[in-house]
């Protein structure tokens, strides 16, 4: 459960991220595909090379969904309900991939904003990303 302090920390981080959705999202996906190659199986139709327009576009969607979750941090489940349905029922993405994506996103934030990602903020952002992953996995049950 996200505390009031966690919510404040997450919102603070996302003020730094909002203008970089496409770049940070693409970097997160590229990092995930390289670090966890089996995740590429969900994107057989994508050009997975660095700088790919498809990766940039999807990365922007990923970070856009995270921003939507931040904007509705008290109702993440409601904010991401349609996305949860899509991933569970149509795309059938293995839920473990949400955790992997979250880890890669944390690394990207740490690279670009090291002074913001204090241990306390890191813990809050990790809790938030786990909450998002849990919401996206909920419809699998």
Swiss-Prot record:
GO terms for cellular component: blood microparticle; haptoglobin-hemoglobin complex; hemoglobin complex. Heme b binds at residue 87. Keywords: Heme, Iron, Metal-binding, Oxygen transport, Transport. Red blood cells. SUPFAM superfamilies: Globin-like (SSF46458). Residues 1-141 form the Globin domain. One of its GO terms (biological process) is hydrogen peroxide catabolic process. GO terms for molecular function: haptoglobin binding; heme binding; iron ion binding; organic acid binding; oxygen binding; oxygen carrier activity; peroxidase activity. InterPro entries: Globin (IPR000971), Globin-like_sf (IPR009050), Globin/Proto (IPR012292), Hemoglobin_a-typ (IPR002338), Hemoglobin_oxygen_transport (IPR050056), Hemoglobin_pi (IPR002339). O2 binds at residue 58. Coiled coil: none annotated. Gene3D superfamilies: Globins (1.10.490.10). It holds the Pfam family Globin. Belongs to the globin family. Involved in oxygen transport from the lung to the various peripheral tissues. Heterotetramer of two alpha chains and two beta chains. This is Hemoglobin subunit alpha-A. It comes from Trigonoceps occipitalis (White-headed vulture).
């Amino acid at each position: 459960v996200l505390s009031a302090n966690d919510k404040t920390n997450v919102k603070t981080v996302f003020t730094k991220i909002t203008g970089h959705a496409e770049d940070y999202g693409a970097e997160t996906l590229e990092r995930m595909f390289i670090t966890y190659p089996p995740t590429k199986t969900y994107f057989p139709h994508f050009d997975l090379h660095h700088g790919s327009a498809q990766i940039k576009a999807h990365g922007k969607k990923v970070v856009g969904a995270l921003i939507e979750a931040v904007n509705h941090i008290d109702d993440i489940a409601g904010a991401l309900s349609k996305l949860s349905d899509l991933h569970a029922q149509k795309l059938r993405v293995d839920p473990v991939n949400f955790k992997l994506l979250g880890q890669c996103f944390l690394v990207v934030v740490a690279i670009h904003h090291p002074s913001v990602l204090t241990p306390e903020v890191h813990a809050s952002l990790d809790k938030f990303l786990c909450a998002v992953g849990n919401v996206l996995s909920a419809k699998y049950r």
